[in-house]
Each structure stands twice: as structure tokens, then as C-alpha cells.
Amino acid sequence: MKIIGLTGGSGTGKGTVAARMRALGAGWVDADAVYRTLCAENREMLSALDTAFGGVTDANGVLDRPKLAKIVFSDPAKLQQLNEITTPYIRKASLDAIHAQSACPIVLYDAPTLFEAGADDFCDKIIAVLAPHDTRVARIIERDGLSDEA
């Protein structure tokens, strides 16, 4: 099994590349989906986030993602702290998901922050998907149903 890292910014076309390779039999793991699952299910990680950022989970232990985003995206040090907490969990869960597809000759690891997270170290090859800024903006507007002003 070969692991191919797939990276690029929002709207570059990573999803299109992944869909075409999956149609040819490649496996696929989406780092963003792994993170969302961890946010919903991993009590240890949620507890660490709640301790670090003070009250970002409710009484049922559900993560308040907008509250966490407001904290970390307004302070680069807090964003780094978030990444330091979550990266080991994302890495382990991603590798587990990749190895669960070991029957596939190729598994794509779709991670927008592949290099920043150090995930390139377990990839055999890397594909960086690029697109002009205007194209990316147009795709995001269409994909997310946004207005031009958004």
C-alpha cells in the first residue's frame, strides 16, 4: 500500500482529484472528517480542549466549535496550542483509518495542513493541488452557496 498525501487550500480541487482517484480504486482518508469525528467522540481530546481553553464544551461534553474558533483564530498562540493538542489525536486516528484500508494499493490522505502537521513524513508521495485565487473564491462561493459579498 502506498500513502499519497493530498494537500492544497480550500477550493483548489482536492475533492475532484480525490473523487477521480477513488473511482480508480484508491482508498481515502479526509483529515478534516477525522477531526470532526474526534470532536464528537474523543472525550480525552475534548477534556484537554476544555481545560486549555476554558469552557468550550457544554454540560454534555459537546464541543462548542464556534466558541473555540473565536478563541483560537484571534490569537496565533492559542491556535498553536490547539494544534499541539489535536495533532497527535488526528495523526493516530488518521493512521488507523489509513491502515484499515490496507487492501487498497493506494490510500489518499487528504489534509489541507499536511506539512504543518508533519503528516508528510508517513506519505510515500505528495500531490499539491493548486488553483488561481479567483478560481478558488468562485468555487467556494458555489460550493457553500455564498453570496459574492461573503
Segments (PLM) and residue ranges:
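ATP-dependent NMP and nucleoside kinases share a basic, alpha-helical "lid"
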Residues: 94-101, 106-142
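ATP-dependent small-molecule kinase phosphotransfer cores
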Residues: 33-105, 150
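Hydrophobic anchor at the beta1->P-loop junction of P-loop NTPases
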Residues: 4-6
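P-loop (Walker A) phosphate-binding loop of NTP-binding proteins
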Residues: 9, 21
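Walker A/P-loop
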Residues: 15
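ATP-binding Walker
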Residues: 12
